[in-house]
Design a protein with these regions (language model features):
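Structural and coupling elements of P-loop NTPases
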Residues: 1-693
Length: 693
């Protein structure tokens, strides 16, 4: 069945890990009649957690699209992961949704994941609703959670359904709109007498009425006149308040036991915005702003919000149709690449189940298989109106590990397999470090990289190990030293002869500088390039640990030559000998990379973070507030000391903090750490005979 845009609700379900998001999604599917039985996260049988790794870990690892059709309305639910290592799912899903349903556990309350989901919704201008799950449990404390929500989410929080209990302990739910109470038997609603919850009831009604009154001048007059609002006025005022970000309605129930889900679905329909009047701002081919309206009569424009890479089926692109409609065989332009993509048969998706559709209309969500160039964040549009929607900014990788191959010969497979995984995971990075000869992958945490490792094995048959990346050290000198290099060899016939005197000294910058100050013809000019080449080749390995030498100035001062035996190779060798003789006497040092660290953390954690930076041999340069209400600590820290900083900042801030690093410069490695670095270089084979002598 095809739905008009006013009968569609695109909703991201987000919150902390374990708050009940996937169970709620599963319960809504079951409640709507789309499933014969309700799957369980514990059993790995839910519709949205269909990836083998999700079933194994009993947690969502990526955003999953689950449409629920109920009483003529299509709810495109996007179940996002709550684990911070997989928060890319929230960033993907929020771009396809008009609304965010923040799931809060009635047992554990407003945890960090709920706070971050709420902030992400607000930052992206999305309508927000809260569902407090597990309210039928003994230790659930709805009203304490409600007060905590008001502190953390602000004054927009407005309870609409509250839990209570009958004398026999039966859970009931009070609908504050209708001021009626209901219990549930086998998921079916049964009205009961309104239980006595004391002074709270009147306070809740007044608070809701005041919130509604603030959405409209006429309603405000009626409120101050002491008149009660009609049901229609309550719903309309609430709807407007939600759309404008003035009200965050709070509902509650039990997903596992099918309690109060009917009230949640009804109000998601009535209160949350449809795509119909939700115009989207894009850029045309000239970079000028253009407004896209949600109408099938408009030229087609669709946004790729998620990609799944499958080694057997191929690539599956999840699309939110912004305007027009998607049909099989249509040719759409990728606004990023300029390439034309031919659409295959449009698909509707329910977890892993795919069903062919005639078309996907404006405002709806679907998928298309085997697009060639499209990737997450791309806009596909009709050639008559090329537009580009803003691409999301995903969290950057913060934990980097080196890849080791379990089976010889798999080295070549790794890069292609990781490239496929990077198509579906924008927070994953991969590079070949030419200096350390290691393949480096980056992710958001240990769990993230562990899942990548498992997917490489299960999806692509490539088994890898992970280890700490090697540090790309440098070497330099602290004082000047002048030495002669003389290469003479007679092997019969023409011999080899080259003789140079070179002054080596420190210089600014991270390069090797060569000059010549030769007077007369002691070294002919045509051999100067050979001398320079010899110096540069020698400087590729320092004398302490075999690392490249930087900040070195070599000046050719004198030398001699033989009219027959001198050659370019002879002068290259002579320059190397001069280098080898001079460097041990020039105060050689090892340099380590220093990175600029920007740690964004709550104010309460600044002391702990700055203390830890100091322990890591870092220097705190300053602190400034950022736009998200966090404090940004700016510091410089040796790269070698940042190995487990991802885990530390997450544990210290309970997941609220994050950080970025950027290379700043090289500095001299403290003397006490030099032996360990030299020994490591020896084990790696950096030290050849010439470097050891």
């Amino acid at each position: 069945m095809k739905y008009a845009s006013n009968n569609i609700r695109n909703i991201l379900i987000a919150g902390h890990a374990g708050s009940g998001k996937t169970t709620l999604t599963e319960a809504l599917v079951y409640f709507s009649g789309a499933a014969e039985r309700m799957g369980r996260v514990e059993d790995g049988t839910t519709i949205s957690d269909f990836d083998p790794e999700e079933a194994k870990r009993k947690a969502s690892l990526s955003a999953s699209v689950v449409p629920v059709e109920y009483e003529g309305i299509k709810y495109n639910l996007i179940d996002a992961p709550g684990l911070f290592d997989f928060e890319a799912g929230e960033y993907e899903g929020i771009r396809a949704a008009e609304s965010v349903l923040v799931c809060v556990s009635g047992r554990s309350g407003v945890t960090v994941g709920a706070e971050k989901a709420f902030q992400l919704a607000r930052k992206n201008g999305k309508a927000t609703m809260v569902f407090v799950s597990k309210c039928d449990l003994e230790n659930a404390n709805y009203f304490k959670i409600l007060e905590d929500m008001k502190i953390k989410f602000g004054a927009t929080v407005c309870p609409c359904v509250v839990p209570a209990k009958l004398d026999d302990g039966t859970p009931v739910y009070i609908n504050l709109f209708s001021q009626k109470a209901f219990k549930y038997e086998g998921g079916k609603q049964v009205q009961v007498d309104l239980p006595d919850i004391g002074h709270r009831f009147q306070g809740l009604i007044e608070a809701m009425s005041e919130a509604i009154a603030e959405t409209d001048d006429e309603l405000m007059e009626k409120f101050f006149g002491g008149e009660a609002f009609t049901t229609e006025e309550i719903v309309e005022g609430m709807r407007k308040g939600v759309k404008d970000g003035l009200i965050t309605p709070v509902f509650c129930g039990s997903a596992v036991n099918q309690q109060a889900l009917d009230m949640l679905l009804y109000n998601m329909h009535k209160l949350l915005p449809s795509p119909e009047h939700n115009s989207v701002l894009a850029e045309d081919a000239n970079g000028e702003p253009v407004e896209l309206t949600c109408a099938e009569s408009e030229p087609a424009a669709a946004y790729v919000f998620k990609t799944v890479a499958d080694p057997f089926v191929g690539k599956l692109s999840y699309l939110r149709v912004v305007s027009g409609k998607l049909t099989a065989g249509a040719s759409l332009v990728n606004a990023r690449t300029g390439e034309t993509e031919k659409m295959g048969k449009p698909l509707t998706v329910l977890g892993k189940k795919q069903t062919e559709a005639e078309s996907i209309g404006a405002g709806d969500i679907g998928a298309v298989a085997k697009l060639v160039s499209a990737k997450t964040g791309d806009t596909l549009c009709d050639a008559s109106r090329v537009v580009k929607l803003p691409a999301p900014v995903f969290p950057k990788p913060s934990l980097f590990m080196a890849v080791t191959v379990a089976k010889k010969g798999d080295e070549g497979k790794i890069s292609s397999a990781l490239a496929r995984l990077m198509e579906e995971d924008p927070t994953l990075s991969y590079l070949n470090n030419a200096e350390t000869h290691q393949q480096i992958i980056g992710g958001l945490g240990e769990q993230h990289l562990d899942v990548v490792k498992a997917k490489l094995k299960n999806k692509f048959g490539v088994e890898i190990g992970l280890e700490a990346p090697r540090i790309a050290y440098r070497e330099s000198i602290r004082k000047a030293c002048q030495k002669q290099g003389r290469h003479k060899k007679q092997t019969g016939g023409h011999g080899q002869f080259g003789d140079v005197v070179i002054n080596f000294e420190p210089c600014d910058g991270e390069q090797v500088v060569f000059e010549e100050k030769v007077f007369g013809g002691s070294v002919p000019k045509n051999f100067f390039p050979a001398v320079e080449k010899g110096v540069r080749l020698a400087a590729e390995k320092g004398v302490l640990a075999g690392y490249p030498v930087v900040g070195l100035k070599a000046t050719l001062l004198d030398g001699s030559y033989h009219p027959v035996d001198s050659s370019e190779m002879a002068f290259i060798m002579a320059a190397k000998l001069a280098y080898k003789a001079a460097m041990p006497e020039a105060g050689p040092v090892i340099l380590e990379p220093i990175h600029t660290l920007k740690a964004h953390v709550p104010n309460d954690n600044t002391g702990d973070i700055m203390g830890d930076v100091t322990k890591r041999r870092g220097r705190v340069l300053g602190m400034e507030p950022d736009e998200d209400g966090l404090q940004t600590i700016i510091a410089e820290v040796p790269l070698a000391e940042l190995a487990n900083f991802t885990t530390f900042i997450r544990q210290t801030t309970q997941g609220r903090g994050w950080f970025t690093t950027e290379f700043a410069r090289y500095e001299i490695l403290p003397e006490m750490l030099v032996p360990a670095v030299v020994e490591q270089a020896r084990k790696l084979g950096n030290l050849d005979e010439s470097a050891d002598d």
